[in-house]
């Protein structure tokens, strides 16, 4: 009896109770809510990265998320935090691997060839999406300050076009039809090529303004206006093409791909001559459809000046957060010396100004 009593007392002191041996072990890894949340974040990030690696834009929501690929660092870091708090080792390894892949693809894409030869033309290009014409006044001020040689304007409806004509079409010369003349050195833009808006909002209206004489050239048929022209800049013929494909909305992905493919075909056909393609591409270097344009040999002006990741949209959060979907692309023979992103107000885009030099071998 004494032995049994001692054993019972010892058992009670240890806290043993009937059935204690059947208690479940402490939960670890993905059995914890934090680990499940980390796994969900990492799965989303990994799906986007897999499409980037596979060189495809896939289907919604991948194209929309690819536009913000650098910002996937934030959910990945959050996933790592939850994985660490949950002691989920696989999640930690997974998160670190995802960070490494994102860091790899943040690097600039595309060529940066430095052409030889002597400078034959200096060109300042400004491109701006004025959002249904709302930012026309801001654009006029920016043009007056920056004094670009060429201006590419997207979403320029009838009122926008009229204001631009009143502000910059001087000396009675209207170059709407691209007829000859001389370069305007006094701040005017007498030469223009336009696709007039036929919709109420005016998103399909586009205008190319030039100090230098323009000749009409075949544009690219698209939902929104994409006019073309040929400029005579100091005796050098330079092809101009305004870019404004449809945005990658879920209901318009097919059109977005088709119109970017048309820009790619244009680039491939004109890589051997001095050419500038500028505008709102509704795509970043992380979209396969845009990279195929760069693969023709065209170079991004912002890439040439080290500003690849500077956001141009949405203006409300840029430069702290956003994506660079506005571009100035150039063919062989061009160098870029400076890039600026300007706040216009009343538009969801920042204007882009790039200083270019055309060189030719002697």
What is each residue range found by the language model?
Residues 125, 131-144, 153-172, 179-362:
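Soluble catalytic domains of enzymes that build or remodel membrane lipids, polysaccharides, and related
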């Amino acid at each position: 009896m004494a032995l049994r009593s001692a054993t019972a007392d010892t058992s009670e002191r240890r806290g043993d109770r009937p059935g204690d041996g059947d208690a479940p072990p402490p939960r670890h890894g993905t059995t914890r809510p934090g680990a499940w949340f980390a796994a969900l974040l990492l799965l989303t990030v990994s799906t986007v990265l897999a499409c980037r690696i596979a060189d495809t834009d896939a289907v919604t929501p991948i194209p929309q998320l690819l536009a913000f690929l650098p910002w996937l660092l934030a959910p990945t870091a959050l996933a790592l935090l939850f994985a660490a708090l949950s002691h989920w080792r696989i999640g930690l390894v997974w998160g670190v691997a995802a960070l490494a892949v994102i860091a790899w693809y943040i690097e600039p894409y595309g060529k940066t060839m430095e052409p030889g030869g002597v400078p034959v033309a200096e060109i300042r290009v400004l491109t701006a999406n004025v959002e249904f014409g709302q930012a026309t006044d801001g654009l006029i001020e920016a043009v007056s300050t920056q004094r670009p040689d060429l201006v590419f304007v997207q979403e320029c409806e009838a009122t926008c076009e009229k204001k631009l004509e009143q502000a910059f079409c001087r000396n009675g010369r209207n170059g709407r039809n691209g007829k000859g003349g001389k370069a305007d050195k006094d701040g005017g833009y007498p030469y223009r090529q336009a696709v007039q808006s036929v919709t109420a909002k005016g998103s399909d209206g586009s205008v190319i303004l030039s100090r230098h004489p323009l000749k009409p050239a075949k544009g690219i048929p698209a939902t929104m206006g994409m006019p073309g022209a040929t400029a005579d800049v100091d005796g050098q013929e330079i092809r101009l093409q305004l870019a404004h494909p449809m945005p990658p909305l879920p209901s318009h992905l097919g059109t977005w791909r088709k119109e970017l493919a048309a820009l790619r075909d244009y680039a491939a056909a004109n890589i051997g001559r001095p050419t500038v393609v500028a505008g709102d591409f509704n795509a970043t270097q992380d979209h396969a459809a845009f990279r195929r344009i760069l693969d023709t040999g065209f170079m991004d002006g912002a890439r040439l000046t080290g500003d690849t990741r500077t956001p141009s949209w949405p203006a409300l959060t840029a430069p702290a957060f956003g994506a660079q979907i506005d571009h100035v692309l150039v063919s062989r023979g061009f160098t870029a010396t400076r890039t600026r992103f300007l706040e216009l107000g009343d538009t969801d885009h920042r204007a882009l100004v790039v200083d270019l030099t055309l060189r030719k071998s002697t």
